[in-house]
Amino acid sequence: MKITELLTKHTIKLNIESKEKENVIDEMVTVLDKAGKLNDRQAYKEAILNRESQSSTGIGEGIAIPHAKTASVINPAIAFGRSKDGVDYESLDGQPAHLVFMIAATEGANNTHLEALSRLSTLLMREEIRKQLLEAESEDAIIDIINQHDKDDDEEEEEEEAAPAPAGKGKILAVTACPTGIAHTFMAADALKEKAKELGVEIKVETNGSSGIKHKLTAQEIEDAPAIIVAADKQVEMERFKGKRVLQVPVTAGIRRPQELIEKAMNQDAPIYQGSGGGSAASNDDEEAKGKSGSGIGNTFYKHLMSGVSNMLPFVVGGGILVAISFFWGIHSADPNDPSYNTFAAALNFIGGDNALKLIVAVLAGFIAMSIADRPGFAPGMVGGFMATQANAGFLGGLIAGFLAGYVVILLKKVFTFIPQSLDGLKPVLIYPLFGIFITGVLMQFVVNTPVAAFMNFLTNWLESLGTGNLVLMGIILGGMMAIDMGGPLNKAAFTFGIAMIDAGNYAPHAAIMAGGMVPPLGIALATTIFRNKFTQRDREAGITCYFMGAAFVTEGAIPFAAADPLRVIPAAVVGAAVAGGLTEFFRVTLPAPHGGVFVAFITNHPMLYLLSIVIGAVVMAIILGIVKKPVTEK
C-alpha cells in the first residue's frame, strides 16, 4: 500500500494557523474529522494527548508526528499540516516544527496499513524530502513528492538485502520500540542505520512495531555482537541478551543521538545485562532517561505496581459491575434465605463477586512478579497472591506477594547460573516454578500472612471507629488525589487504596474516591454549559461528552481541558473533587462496588446523599472555572 492511499488532498493543510502545540493538535484533528476519518473526534484527540504526555512527538529537524491507534478512527489516515514560520511543538531539539504529520490508525489496523504509516516516518528522516515538502506550492505537489520517494516494504527489503553492509569495525545490533509502534520505532531504526552507514559500521536493527517484529535478531547474531542498543519505551524481549553488553535508552535517543549510541556500542561502553527481566528503555546509565522518566527505587516500584494494577482492572470492573447489576433485585438478592432472592441475581453475584473479584489479589500479585522477573515470576506471584486472599491478608498481602515472588525468581536466576547452557530449557519449566512457588509459599505462610492479616483487621477497625471529622478529612484527601493528575500516579494510588479497603470489607473510602473521580469531567461539562462565553464552540461540544464520561467514572475525560489550561482547570478540579469526597464521608456513604459511576449509586447506603455530594462537587468546580477563566472571542 502506498502512503498516498492514506494521505489525500482532503487531509492536507498547507498553512497551519495555530502557533502552539495544543491548538495545532486541535487543528489537525479537525482536518481528519472533516475528511470523515473519525467517529469520535474527542476520543481521538484524547488518545493523541495521552501519547504526547509520554514524550513529545516533536522529534526535531522541524518535524512533529502526533499519532494514535484507537477505535475512534474509522479508516487509517494521515493528515499533513505545514507552517513555514514554525510552531512551538515542545520539540526535542527545542526548535519550531514546520511539518506536522498526524497519523490515525484503527484499533484493528491490518499490517498493510501499519507498514505504510510506519514507512512515512522513515521518509521524513531525509533532509531533501523535508526541504521539498516545505517548498511545495499545492496539495498535488505534496502528493507527488511522497509518491516519488515512497517504496513498498518488499522493495525496501530487496534493496536492503542487495546492498552489502559496509566493511567496518564489527557488527552491532539494535532494537527499537515505542508504545504505539507506528512512528518513533521506525524513525529510530532509520536514524541508527543511516548513521552506521556514514560511520562505516555494520548494523542490524530489529523493529517492534504495530505490525509485529521485523528483522528479528538471531541467536548467532546476538552471540557475535560486541554490544546491543535497545532504544525502547515499552517492554521488549530482553532475556536473550543476558551476559551481553546492552545499552538501554529511550526510543527518542535513537532518533536524536544515533552517533553517540553507535560509538558507545562499538567501544563496548555499556553494562553487561544480568537478566533482570526488564525491557524498559529508561536505564540508570542514560542521563536522558534519568531526566525524563525518573530513576531509583520509587520509579521502579511504581512501574511494577502499575503493571499489576492495570492487569487487575478488567477483573475489578467486570466483576464489580456484575455484582452491582445483581443488586437491582435487592442488596440481599443472592441470599437463598432472603425474601428478595432471585436465581439470576445470585448467578451474577456468584460470577462477579465469588469468582472475578476473588481473583483480583492473585492477578495483581502475578503481574507485579511478572513485571519484575518476566514470565517465570508469574506463577509464584499468582500463588502468593491467592494465599494472601485465603489468609485474609488482602490487598496488602497481595502487593507483598507480588514483589516477594518477583525478586525470589530474580535471585533464583542468579543462583542457577552454574547450570550448563544445554540445560537452560529446564529453568523456565521446572526450576523457576518449583523453587519459586515453594520459597514464595513458605514465606507467605510462615512470615507474611499472619501479621499482614492482623494489620488489615486493625486498619479496618480503625477506619470504622473514626469520628466524622477524621472521616471527612480522609474523604477530602482521597477525592482531591483523584483529580490532581487524572489517571496518573496519585489517581491510581487513591483508586488502589479504595479497592484494598473494599477487599478488607470497608466501603467508605471508595465512595469518596469514586465521587472525586467523577467530578472533573462533570465540573467541566457544567462549566461549558453555564459559562458559555468562557469556552469556544469546540470546547462546548466536547463538554457534552464530559457529562457521559463523568457519569461513568472516566476521570480522563477532563484531560484535554486540563492539558489546554492546567493552571485554572486542575486547581478547580481538585477543590471540587475534595468537596465531593469530604461530603460523602460527612454523610457516611458506603459503596461496595469498585466501578460504575452514578449507575451504581443505588447500591450505596444513602443513594440520594451520594448523588448530592457529586453534584455539589461538580457545581463548585464549575463556579471556580467560571470565575477564573476569561471570556473567549471566537474568530
Swiss-Prot record:
GO biological process: phosphoenolpyruvate-dependent sugar phosphotransferase system
Positions bearing Phosphocysteine: C178
Matches recorded under Pfam families: PTS_EIIA_2, PTS_EIIC, PTS_IIB
Entries under SUPFAM superfamilies matching the protein: Phoshotransferase/anion transport protein (SSF55804), PTS system IIB component-like (SSF52794)
Annotated ranges, domain PTS EIIC type-2: 301-635
Claim: rRNA processing is one of the keywords in the record: no
Comment, domains: The PTS EIIA type-2 domain is phosphorylated by phospho-HPr on a histidyl residue. Then, it transfers the phosphoryl group to the PTS EIIB type-2 domain.
UniProt-recorded name of the protein: PTS system fructose-specific EIIABC component
Gene name of this polypeptide: fruA
